Amino acid sequence: MTYETNTPTEESIIPKHEDGEEYNSIYLSRFEKDISISQTLDFSQFMQTQILLTAKRKALELGDDRSPINNDPYNIRRSDFDELSEYTASKSPSIISEASHNSPSRELDDSGDENTSKLTGTKQSMLKARNRQAAQKCRIKKKKYLQTLQDQVNYYTSENKELLQSANDLREEIIKLRTLVFAHRDCPVSKACSKALFLMGKEKPLTPP
């Protein structure tokens, strides 16, 4: 980092008057000019320079001849000022926080957060749409399955009724046949059949229906 300073010559130094006012006013303007900051300084160096300027003004207002700025203005250190640490602790954080709040990186973070929120919203919308489609397909599949089961129930119910009707018809047919056979039990043909069945071991007594 670079500083743009003008080193004073012996001719440019103004001796201090007894009251010190003329010396202080002229010397303050020269001091501010000598420590002018170029645009290439970073923020921390800028803050340090501003703190030194404030300390210089306060020292001149108090008229303290023992101020390190009055004694050796071109060899100033932080430890020479009692109020420097307090001023830094009270003023610098607010200025730094304000600068960081308005910094381009903060703007980039905000824009990144907005893009992230938009992307998250888009993903959520797509996820909800997929969930709706999946739920609709599941409902359609379940409806088809239930309809298939109902069709099977109807089919087997109808078939059962038909089989029951056929069983009843067959029972009636059996009763009719047994009635006819019993009516012809004294017929020679019936006797011959009974004898043949007896010889085969399958004869059964004829009973009325």
From Swiss-Prot:
GO terms (BP aspect): regulation of transcription by RNA polymerase II
Compositional bias of kind Polar residues: 90-103
Molecular-function annotations in GO: DNA-binding transcription factor activity, RNA polymerase II-specific; RNA polymerase II cis-regulatory region sequence-specific DNA binding
UniProt-annotated stretches for the region Leucine-zipper: 163-177
Coarse class of the protein's main subcellular location: nucleus
Residue stretches making up the bZIP domain: 121-184
Compartments (UniProt record): Nucleus
Family recorded in the similarity comment: Belongs to the bZIP family.
Protein name stated in the entry: Transcription factor atf31
Native organism: Schizosaccharomyces pombe (strain 972 / ATCC 24843) (Fission yeast)
